[in-house]
Amino acid sequence: MPQISFEVVAECPHTRARAGVLHTAHGDIETPVFMPVGTQATVKGLTQRDLAEDLGVKILLSNTYHLYLRPGHELIRQMGGLHKFMSWPNAILTDSGGFQVFSLSGLRKIHEHGVVFQSHLNGDTHKFTPESTVDVQLAYGSDILMVLDECPEYPVSHEYARESMQRTVRWAREANEHFLERMKQMPTRHALFPIVQGSMFTDLRRECATALVDLDTDGYAIGGLSVGEPRPLSLEVVEATEAILPRTKPRYAMGVGMPAELPEYVARGIDMMDCVLPSRNARNGYLFTSEGRVIIKHARYKDDEGPLDPRCACYTCKSYSRAYLRHLFQSGEILFSVLATRHNIQRYLDIMREIRHAIISGSFPDYLRCVQSSLHDAG
């Protein structure tokens, strides 16, 4: 019995785009879906009520590495799991921690059966293995767990990318075997997604995807994106990879993207995406609107009485002027981050809802052509 189920409700005959529903133990998720990032079990500046009730977020992403170091997976287990710990009623996807560990560079060492790393908090030594990261994420009670993978930097040689990809495949097999054994004793439902790697080499991506499909997991992720590569290359890699992944399973593009990129990935068969940009850029005064990007510190907004985005129905846009938002930002007020983050996440969610509606109504190609021009400033 699958740990989650996925059904496709509409497909675009002219692209690879599809609309679906992902069924999890913590509710149904309409796809394509954008997942806000709650690294430390919180989306900075927003409460869980803001996210679930006001914005309608159905799934969040949290970070295995950061929560493992603080407060620790055993404490989270003792507190009843991550859902109860952070008072979140809907689904949670946790990454494996691999991206963060491999970003540590001099603070980690790769072995065939895992990676040893030093905590960026206090220098303590830790080890992640394919099996241990599964156990950590099960302690969290995550609905969707990610397999430990190696995310190489960009660019790397074809030789190293192949070695890294083969290691990722071995880790995926080990993690999946352990996960299936753990599921025999678990009363709750969880799903495991392996991650396709291979840097920007399409032959390696295809080889990796083919090997991972043999595991017959509940879904598949495409990692190693947004690591400095040109956007056309990223889209090319996704297109080559997606062609091998089963149409009956959800596909997740990790760490993407800007507003103008979202429909491009959906057009290539992607169902799930996440990115820190809407919240991080919000805190830095970069706001996404239906008319393009607004850099709120610019002087032209000093006496602008209009809403941030006239087409947006979020609380920020219904209640405050651009002039007031600029005042908050220039004054360093915490309220700015709250209002800006709320708006940016709303904008991303609105884009995904527009995409889904376009797929179901049969107008996605027209939507894609329109959005490529209207959102180019935001991308």
From Swiss-Prot:
Q: Which GO terms describe its biological process?
A: queuosine biosynthetic process; tRNA wobble guanine modification; tRNA-guanine transglycosylation
Q: Protein name, please?
A: Queuine tRNA-ribosyltransferase
- Matches recorded under NCBIfam families: Q_tRNA_tgt (TIGR00430), tgt_general (TIGR00449)
Q: Which UniProt keywords apply?
A: Glycosyltransferase, Metal-binding, Queuosine biosynthesis, Transferase, tRNA processing, Zinc
Which residues does UniProt assign to the signal peptide? none
Mind naming one GO cellular-component term on file for this protein? cytosol
User: Which residues take part in binding substrate?
Assistant: D95, S96, G97, G98, F99, D149, Q197, G224
Any one Pfam family match given in the protein's UniProt record, by short name: TGT
Reaction(s) catalyzed by this protein? 7-aminomethyl-7-carbaguanine + guanosine(34) in tRNA = 7-aminomethyl-7-carbaguanosine(34) in tRNA + guanine
Q: What HAMAP family does the record tag this protein with?
A: Q_tRNA_Tgt (MF_00168)
**Coiled-coil intervals in this record?**
none
- Which cofactor is recorded for it? Zn(2+)
Subunit-level organization: Homodimer. Within each dimer, one monomer is responsible for RNA recognition and catalysis, while the other monomer binds to the replacement base PreQ1.
Q: Which residues form the active site?
A: D95 (proton acceptor), D274 (nucleophile)
The record's section on InterPro entries has: ArchSynthase1/Queuine_TRR (IPR050076), TGT (IPR004803), TGT-like_sf (IPR036511), tRNA_ribo_trans-like (IPR002616)
* Organism of provenance: Solibacter usitatus (strain Ellin6076)
Its biological purpose is as follows:
Catalyzes the base-exchange of a guanine (G) residue with the queuine precursor 7-aminomethyl-7-deazaguanine (PreQ1) at position 34 (anticodon wobble position) in tRNAs with GU(N) anticodons (tRNA-Asp, -Asn, -His and -Tyr). Catalysis occurs through a double-displacement mechanism. The nucleophile active site attacks the C1' of nucleotide 34 to detach the guanine base from the RNA, forming a covalent enzyme-RNA intermediate. The proton acceptor active site deprotonates the incoming PreQ1, allowing a nucleophilic attack on the C1' of the ribose to form the product.
Task: Report a single Gene Ontology molecular function.
Answer: metal ion binding
Describe how the cofactor binds. Binds 1 zinc ion per subunit.
E.C. designation(s): 2.4.2.29
Matching entries from Gene3D superfamilies are given as:
Queuine tRNA-ribosyltransferase-like
- Pathway named in the protein's UniProt entry: tRNA modification; tRNA-queuosine biosynthesis
